[in-house]
């Protein structure tokens, strides 16, 4: 059996009772933190909560190691942990599919993810369009996909959730400031007038914690603001309902 469980967004207290129950029964627990990470806790605290050691998968050998855990799940009860919800990342969906192809029972335990946590913004979830990821630019690698996604969503009046790059193995997490700066640099190159310093944006910091940061304002004012510790994400709002306007006014710190 393969149990795929989410750890939630922030710390070990996000672990569900269902996950705790299965953790007691399984033979071994694996985890990966290359797609997301819990910034409010440590591996030691998670292990203490689950009362069992955790083997963290190596990002460089992920294909080999995930195949290994699937093979183990043929004869043992294996738990695979991820930050957020276990079925949000396509790599995790692939693991579940491959396990089922091999006739392995798969149990999925859902958990809070950024897709549910953005509800704290008061923006209506059904009005979000396609999600995009803003990555750290590298030499000869500066993808412009976020720009295109924002452009397409705005045409339809949809909000855009921009997930910011996580390089957990390097303890490098893109800040909202870096994400906004990256978007402006793409605009400077494309010059299609999709966004500018005058564009309004929302920043969510430390979603899932008891004290998340919610900030709203023009990009030119947000870009130098201190949003404090990660993780951050950016939302480019589309057409706003009057209730959403009230949410941005009263639930956010207006910059």
From Swiss-Prot:
Pathway: Protein modification; peptidyl-diphthamide biosynthesis. GO terms for molecular function: diphthine synthase activity. GO terms for biological process: methylation; protein histidyl modification to diphthamide. InterPro entries: 4pyrrol_Mease (IPR000878), 4pyrrol_Methylase_sf (IPR035996), 4pyrrole_Mease_sub1 (IPR014777), 4pyrrole_Mease_sub2 (IPR014776), Dphthn_synthase (IPR004551). It holds the Pfam family TP_methylase. Gene3D superfamilies: Cobalt-precorrin-4 Transmethylase, Domain 1, Methyltransferase, Cobalt-precorrin-4 Transmethylase, Domain 2. Keywords: Methyltransferase, S-adenosyl-L-methionine, Transferase. Its EC number is 2.1.1.98. S-adenosyl-L-methionine binds at residues 9, 85, 88, 113-114, 164, 207, 232. It catalyses: 2-[(3S)-amino-3-carboxypropyl]-L-histidyl-[translation elongation factor 2] + 3 S-adenosyl-L-methionine = diphthine-[translation elongation factor 2] + 3 S-adenosyl-L-homocysteine + 3 H(+). It comes from the Archaea. CDD domains: DHP5_DphB. S-adenosyl-L-methionine-dependent methyltransferase that catalyzes the trimethylation of the amino group of the modified target histidine residue in translation elongation factor 2 (EF-2), to form an intermediate called diphthine. The three successive methylation reactions represent the second step of diphthamide biosynthesis. Belongs to the diphthine synthase family. Homodimer. This is Diphthine synthase. It comes from Methanococcus maripaludis (strain C6 / ATCC BAA-1332). The gene is dphB.
